[in-house]
UniProtKB/Swiss-Prot annotation:
There is a cross-link at K279 (Glycyl lysine isopeptide (Lys-Gly) (interchain with G-Cter in SUMO2)). Residues 73-208 are annotated as: Interaction with C1D. Residues 1-31 are annotated as: Disordered. It comes from Mus musculus. Pfam families: Translin. Ring-shaped heterooctamer of six TSN and two TSNAX subunits. Interacts with GOLGA3, TSNAXIP1, SUN1 and AKAP9. Interacts with the homodimeric form of C1D following gamma-radiation. Interacts with TSN and C1D in a mutually exclusive manner. This is Translin-associated protein X.
Amino acid sequence: MNGKEGPGGFRKRKHDTFPHNQRREGKDASLSSPVMLAFKSFQQELDARHDKYERLVKLSRDITVESKRTIFLLHRITSAPDMEEILTESESKLDGVRQKILQVAQELSGEDMHQFHRAVTTGLQEYVEAVSFQHFIKTRSLISMEEINKQLTFTAEDSGKESKTPPAEGQEKQLVTWRLKLTPVDYLLGVADLTGELMRMCINSVGNGDIDTPFEVSQFLRQVYDGFSFIGNTGPYEVSKKLYTLKQSLAKVENACYALKVRGSEIPKHMLADVFSVKTDMIDQEESIS
């Protein structure tokens, strides 16, 4: 039997000839090497970043759900007897949404917003849609991005957390602030989604005998469409994609205004909504065929 072969004729591996203690010391030394320590820190940093991303995704979902509920509430204005009561309730709901956005701002404090933008963009777009819908109902105008950004500036009083360490004598109390700035793309996509809600509001208002709202909405949508037309295909892909949906909403509202102007006296008010819904379905079918 060869001296290099162990019992049973199996050839010994080279590392089997090393003493056991020597192998353990080599393993411990490799774990404490600068390279291993560097990769260990990279692992911890990536794990922390992934955990933060998941928390932001969850907050974005909550913001989306609460914003949609606010939009559904605002649609009741066309049939509700007390408009102010619904506006007050919608404001309290939007305050709750802003508390969620405050948590997002706290998570992103000291971080690069663009690294986590994909996690929160859906919720921010839905919030823009809800707050701009409420603003249009109140003022018949479009809320600016600067106004929304002002609403997304928070202090320690907004979060309900006061600083536990009192300021020293002669030092003024520093006010902790958190800001979350919308990107222009988030704002534009939220406004583009708003046009679909305004189209539904137009049809619902006609069904309740409100003849003025469709013409106000039509004029507003034309201005929004003209603004988006200046961007055209030069802007982000998502914006140019929304432009087609915006054009559809404008066509449906203009069709409703045309029917009101030309045939409004022929059709009873309680049947107007049914006529418009049939015509919008016909428009959808024609566009799908083309």
